Regions:
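An active-site-proximal structural segment forming one wall of the substrate-binding cleft
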Residues: 1-20, 129-130
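Aromatic-lined carbohydrate-recognition surfaces of secreted/lumenal glycan-active proteins
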Residues: 1-4, 20-30, 42-63, 107-108
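Aromatic- and acid-rich polysaccharide-binding/catalytic face
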Residues: 17-29, 63, 67-85
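Beta-propeller domains
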Residues: 31-32, 36-38
Length: 181
């Protein structure tokens, strides 16, 4: 409670004109060691009318019981992008599991998304699979893009990178479901 109260107080002191404190994010990516404190925190945030969000990793402990733990939204991490040895079927499995558990999804990519690094196809695969399974049109999406991946794509001198940047932006802005929280 102390931490939440401190964040709220410091945020309110700033009197931001165009930014709202809409909710809180639980940083632990599984529920193995924190499960007993999540629900009381969720209850407190509910009293304060804040959203409580979680992004568990693929097949993590507790991902199926995210609602029972008290989260408003859980965004399932496919963890597909990072390791080239992980097959495309991981995205199929992740999409099916997220839909089965009524979860949202996370799209992941990093600064090595540039064509020169040979990983652009993995971001392309996320976009294709999210559309194939209806995630793009039915689910909220969280985006993990490392440090500067979008800027790196946008300002690349390689036309394929800039094209991927525009394709990704179009993917985001044309989604049927878009709201702030």
């Amino acid at each position: 409670k102390w931490f939440i109260d401190q964040v709220r107080a410091r945020f309110n002191e700033k009197r931001y004109q165009y930014v709202d404190l809409a909710g809180f994010y639980w940083i632990a990516e599984d529920a193995s060691h924190t499960g007993n404190i999540i629900t009381p925190i969720a209850n407190y945030l509910n009293e304060l009318k804040y959203s409580f969000n979680w992004i568990p990793f693929f097949n993590s402990d507790g991902h199926e019981s995210w609602k029972e733990l008290g989260f408003h939204y859980a965004y399932y991490q496919p963890n597909y992008y990072f390791d080239d040895k992980i097959p495309l079927t991981r995205l199929d499995e992740a999409c099916k599991e997220a839909l089965r558990c009524n979860m949202q999804m996370e799209m992941e990519f990093e600064d090595d998304v540039l064509a020169a690094h040979g990983k652009a196809y993995r971001l392309e695969n996320y976009m294709a699979k999210f559309k194939e399974y209806g995630v793009w049109e039915k689910c909220r999406l969280a985006y993990y893009q490392s440090n500067n991946a979008l800027l790196t794509l946008k300002y690349s001198s390689e036309p394929a990178d800039v094209a991927l940047y525009h394709k990704f932006c179009k993917f985001v802005i044309e989604r049927p479901i878009r709201d702030s929280h």
